[in-house]
Regions:
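Short, cationic motifs built from Arg/Lys/His that form the positively charged side of catalytic pockets
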Residues: 71, 77, 130, 143-144, ...
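C-terminal catalytic core of Y-nucleophile DNA break-rejoin enzymes
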Residues: 168-188
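Basic, Lys/Arg- and aromatic-enriched nucleic-acid-binding interface segment
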Residues: 101, 105, 114-145
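Short functional hotspots where side chains directly engage DNA or cofactors
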Residues: 160-166
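Short, basic/aromatic-rich helical patch in the C-terminal catalytic core of site-specific tyrosine
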Residues: 76, 134, 148
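N-terminal core-binding DNA-recognition domain of tyrosine recombinases/integrases
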Residues: 8-103, 118-123
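N-terminal helical hairpins
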Residues: 1
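Short, charged phosphate-coordinating catalytic segments
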Residues: 138-160
């Protein structure tokens, strides 16, 4: 088997496990980058720990961001573990690179006040008001963008102050309590 054929086997496994289309698309995109180093025509038994380590060095020389390097390595490691577990190739240890933790820049209090300031309903456009409601809901609940997009009016329980998030990354629905001010914002919206 070639490396490319083995990557396709892993994609088929992802489909069989019913992974999301976005996840499969991510792997395909990652493979395009990995194929710049490992030819898809390379026999899989030629992929050794030495070649893996050479790839790590190649990434360090060609990419400046350690997080990006680890994203490619994580995808490759996951694929290779699948191949090793299914005895398509010999087993060897792999690891991603060590990354320095960066302090994430957060909003200042002034920026938060500006972002969360209620627009004048009589003067703002619907889009401005909608953006403010969405911002408040995201800050209030911490839900993901995709979960927000999939929300329906019926998912808001105004009586019990609960938001039913049906679509989540883990595919497990969530019941999120809403505070009274968020409920009032949603009622106006």
């Amino acid at each position: 088997l070639t490396f490319g054929e083995c990557c396709e086997l892993y994609i088929q496994d992802c489909k069989a496990r019913n992974l999301r289309a976005a996840t499969i698309s991510h792997y395909r995109s990652s493979y395009k980058q990995i194929y710049k180093y490992f030819s898809p025509d390379m026999p899989i038994d030629e992929l050794t720990v030495n070649k893996y380590n050479s790839y790590v060095i190649y990434l360090k020389e060609h990419l400046s961001n350690d997080v990006s390097i680890n994203a490619y390595l994580r995808d490759l490691i996951t694929t290779l573990h699948y191949l090793m577990d299914n005895e398509y190739m010999p087993t060897f240890k792999m690891q991603s690179i060590k990354v320095d933790k960066m302090v994430k820049e957060t909003y200042t209090d002034a920026e938060l006040k500006l972002l969360l300031k209620k627009p004048n309903i009589n003067k703002c456009t619907f889009i401005e008001f909608e953006a403010w409601v969405i911002t408040c809901l995201l800050f209030s609940t911490g839900i993901r963008q995709h979960s927000l997009i999939e929300l329906k009016v019926k998912d808001i329980d105004f009586d019990n102050l609960i938001l039913n998030v049906r679509v989540t990354k883990t595919r497990k629905p969530l019941l999120i309590p809403l505070n009274v001010s968020m409920i009032n914002i949603l009622k106006v919206f």
